[in-house]
Every structure is written in structure tokens, then in C-alpha cells.
């Protein structure tokens, strides 16, 4: 059922290492469109892509050893990196500035989805824009009112903090959202603002 959903433009909710995520096959524009509609998310707010190392070179471009150092230190885990998108990616995956937010997730359910679908997955939080993130499958069900095709129940998630988002596009990397991984921890690897 889950594999079929990934191959047929379906939207799934699933546990991650932070909150429940919402997404599906990242290469299907219809999935991205449905995620925006379900979340009532403004189209100018880009979506995050959860990936594994083997997909990363096809998604993003970088030539900075600090990025490799960050990946080695914090991945898999709750660090989202904003990198230059591969220009060959479908437009629905690229931000207007040619970037892509990516994370190599440590969550077994999300890793399983990537493996089952043989694709990276959209992995934004499973909540309505402006509402609290969901820590249980029941919260996802109640908040999103049956708009999701499949909900994978991973129990109650304990972290209750979002991933840290780090923009790696300038000489001085910038923390855009403080989350599980602190600026102090990142500064041990490379300087950030």
C-alpha cells in the first residue's frame, strides 16, 4: 500500500526525527501541489526534500568542504541544508533563487519511504500553516481532516523541536531556523551567523 502510494502521486504523513512529516515522491509535481494545498502553505515558501546520500548529487551542487564536514557531523539527523539545486531538477523542487532545502533523515520510517519509492521525498511538517506541528498520527488526522492519503503511525514523537535550517549559499553560513542542532554545535564544525 505505501509503495503504491509513492508511485501514484499520493500524499503520506510519516514520523521523522522531529515531528510528523507530510510528503511523497518529490519528483511528482502533483504531490508538491497537493502538499501546498493540504497545508494551505504559500507557494513562495519552498518545500524540504528528505534524501539519502545516493540521491544527493543529483539534487544539489556544492564545492565547499564545510558542507561535507557538516554532513559528516550531523547526518543522518535533524540538520536541513539549503544548497544550490541541480539546474536539471524539475522547477517545482527549486526555490526561486535556484536552491533546495535537503536533509538526510535519521528516521527509519522516512528512510524506508525513500527506499520503497526509489526516490527522495518531500518532507515538510504535517500541519496546517501557522498551526502547531504534530507529534502523533492522531494529531495529523485531526488537524489535516482526512486530506492525507496514508498516515504511518509511528507513535508519539519525543523530540518536539524542528530541524535546524542552515543556509549554505554565502561565505558565512546562516542559521535560518534554530532547532535540534544548536548554533554552538554547528560552530564546532564551521562558523555560522
Briefly describe each language-model feature range.
Residues 1-193:
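Active-site-adjacent structural elements in enzyme catalytic cores
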Amino acid at each position: 500500500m505505501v509503495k503504491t502510494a509513492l508511485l501514484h502521486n499520493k500524499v503520506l504523513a510519516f514520523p521523522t526525527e522531529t515531528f510528523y512529516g507530510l510528503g511523497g515522491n518529490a519528483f511528482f509535481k502533483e504531490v508538491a501541489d497537493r502538499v501546498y494545498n493540504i497545508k494551505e502553505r504559500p507557494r513562495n515558501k519552498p518545500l524540504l526534500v528528505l534524501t539519502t546520500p545516493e540521491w544527493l548529487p543529483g539534487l544539489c551542487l556544492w564545492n565547499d568542504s564545510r558542507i561535507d564536514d557538516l554532513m559528516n557531523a550531523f547526518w543522518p539527523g535533524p540538520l536541513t541544508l539549503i544548497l544550490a539545486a541541480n539546474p536539471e531538477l524539475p522547477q517545482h523542487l527549486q526555490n526561486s533563487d535556484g536552491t533546495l532545502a535537503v536533509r538526510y533523515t535519521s528516521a527509519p520510517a522516512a528512510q524506508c519511504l525513500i527506499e520503497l519509492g526509489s526516490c527522495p521525498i518531500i518532507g515538510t511538517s504535517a500541519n496546517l500553516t501557522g498551526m502547531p506541528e504534530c507529534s502523533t498520527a492522531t494529531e495529523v488526522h485531526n488537524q489535516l481532516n482526512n486530506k492525507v492519503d496514508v498516515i504511518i503511525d509511528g507513535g508519539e514523537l519525543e523530540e518536539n523541536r524542528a530541524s535546524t535550517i542552515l543556509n549554505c549559499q554565502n561565505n558565512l553560513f546562516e542559521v535560518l531556523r534554530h532547532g535540534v542542532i544548536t548554533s554552538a554545535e554547528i560552530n564546532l564544525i564551521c562558523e555560522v551567523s
